[in-house]
């Protein structure tokens, strides 16, 4: 994905037009923009929302490990969980279709009633690892890291905007930049 500041700015403004509002919308929508832009196929089947079933977010593991169904019900009641609407808008713009099976009612029902321990012990997503052992023998399996963090460097790449002319209020966080985008205070000439 591009690291050029001008390209970043144009892409973030475009994501805003497609519905990005929150920091997570911009940081998670950014790679999806490039996936759909470069996708040769007409349909993308994604794993968006999968982590919610396993309750492996920081918040989930700290506060809801023993109340996993409450955690899931809260997540999946949000019609835009995992930036679903933004992803559908990006797909539509590029005349593509997106299929998000982990957000389907059937998948939500399939996970209903499962516990954190049965899904994640002795390893994160152990239930999936055990059901597809032959496949996972062939690849390196890592623990969960948010899409926009870790080795993707998506979020850290965006921090360059704090040094440029979009930082009109001397923000310390890129969230301020996203708020300026939402208020229509920044643009590209």
Task: Please place each PLM-identified region on the residue numbering.
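Peripheral terminal appendages
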Residues: 64, 138-189
């Amino acid at each position: 994905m591009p690291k050029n500041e001008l390209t970043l700015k144009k892409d973030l403004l475009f994501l805003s037009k497609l519905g990005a509002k929150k920091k997570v919308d911009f940081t998670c929508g950014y790679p999806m923009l490039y996936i759909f832009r470069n996708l040769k196929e007409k349909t993308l089947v994604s794993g968006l929302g999968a982590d919610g079933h396993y309750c492996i977010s920081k918040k989930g593991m700290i506060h809801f490990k023993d109340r996993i169904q409450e955690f899931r019900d809260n997540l999946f009641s949000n019609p835009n969980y995992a930036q679903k609407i933004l992803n559908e808008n990006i797909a539509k713009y590029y005349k593509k279709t997106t299929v998000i099976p982990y957000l389907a009612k059937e998948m939500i029902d399939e996970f209903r009633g499962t516990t954190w321990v049965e899904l994640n012990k002795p390893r994160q997503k152990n239930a999936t690892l055990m059901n597809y052992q032959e496949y996972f023998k062939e690849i390196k399996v890592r623990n969960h890291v948010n899409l926009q963090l870790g080795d993707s460097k998506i979020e850290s790449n965006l921090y360059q905007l704090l040094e440029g002319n979009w930082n009109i209020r001397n923000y310390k966080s890129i969230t301020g930049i996203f708020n300026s985008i939402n208020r229509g205070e920044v643009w590209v000439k």
